Amino acid sequence: MPPSDTQSPAANNAHEFSVSEISFALKKTVEETFGHVRVRGEITGYRGPHSSGHCYFGLKDDKARMDAVIWKGNFGKLRFKPEEGMEVIATGKLTTYPGSSKYQIVIDHLEPAGVGALMALLEERRKKLAAEGLFAAERKRALPFLPEVIGVVTSPTGAVIRDILHRLQDRFPRHVIVWPVRVQGETSAAEVAAAIRGFNAMEKGGKTPRPDLLIIARGGGSIEDLWSFNEEIVVRAAAESAIPLISAIGHETDTTLIDFASDRRAPTPTAAAEMAVPVRAELLADVRDKGSRLIRCEARAIESYRTQLGGLARGLPKLQDLVALPRQRFDTAADRLGRALIRAAEVKRARLSRVEGRLSDRPIRLRIANERKGLPQLLQRLTRAETRRVADLARSLDGSTKLLESYSYHGVLKRGYAVVRDETGKPIRAGAGQTAGARIEIEFAEDRLDAVVAPGGTVAPRKAPPKKPGGGQGSLL
């Protein structure tokens, strides 16, 4: 049989909904039925906050999955940073999103599903950073014995900063610079890391002195409260710090990852201040004690040397005994030397007498005569060489003179030209720009002429100075 076009009475009596109507009806039913709920699940699809500041991800278990959203205002209040795969307990309102007909939970509060989950995440992160070498012992730096400037990264309010400042004042007052940060909350980790890097970026000798030592401090709290100091950004900043760093997070039983990256870990903020500086009174007492011991040691050493010197002096022979034998030897040698000199002179005189008769100046005279015969020839050669040299110099001088005359402007003047100079002696290249009444000098080949620029650009000869009375010869100057 063909299908019938008729509908059942029940279908004809059913209310007709639009898509929007049924979607909003379901939304209302879900919200009124469930209201606020607590859901335990594993975070999936987490990519951090959206550009709007809201955070979208999913919650799942081994059988189902649901969408979740944290609005921007609530996300900033979280005490820890959500991560992919973390098991959490979400508290919020169950609702639907009509645009896609999906239900979701709008989270007001998020917490780890037990301390065990956070500890597992912490251990996994510790192993990862340790494998990178951030916790290696060779990276640790020694703390300065007495830092001039100490930088403290902590909350500006509360007991922690007061305890540190009070302890430093008691032990050894130092210049302290406090970089205020939030020590828990979503922005805490970024602020702490920025403070560490900010201190390291300061220049030595700048307006604000660069610290010689850093203290990162926070009071006690739960693992969630201290979680900012387990974030990678903080641990890496501490490991990269060029300034030695002391971590003092929580109480002695609390351990955070920054403790592994720091150069020293203090169980409390007060203990960090004690590590930072010695006790001034103890140093002064130690200096006085060592000074007294040094003086006593010097006195004992001087007395010991004096005793040894006295013993050595008593063992020395008398001066007269030391020089008596050498003096006797000297006298004997002096007598022998005088006699030896006389005998040597007599021997030399006798030898000279024997050879005196054999001495003759004939060989020397013959050599002088032979050398004298060659003098005229040498003189002629010298004369010819000097004559040639003088002739060469004369030719060179004549050539240089002609070349100099060819470059000299006097040759141009001889062809009828003249050189015009101003009062300072500088040549004038054009008449334009010369003012009337200006004095100029015109140089010809044989003489010079002083002139004055007349109005209109002509040159008028300058009047000669009046002659002196008496008719005598005037001054050439």
From Swiss-Prot:
What Gene Ontology molecular function terms does this protein carry?
exodeoxyribonuclease VII activity; nucleic acid binding
> What GO biological process terms does the UniProt entry carry, in alphabetical order?
DNA catabolic process
Q: Indicate where this protein is primarily found.
A: cytoplasm
Show which residues constitute the signal peptide: none
Naming one, the record's GO cellular component terms include: exodeoxyribonuclease VII complex
Compartments it resides in: Cytoplasm
Free-text function comment from the UniProt entry: Bidirectionally degrades single-stranded DNA into large acid-insoluble oligonucleotides, which are then degraded further into small acid-soluble oligonucleotides.
Return the protein name. Answer: Exodeoxyribonuclease 7 large subunit
Name the gene. Answer: xseA
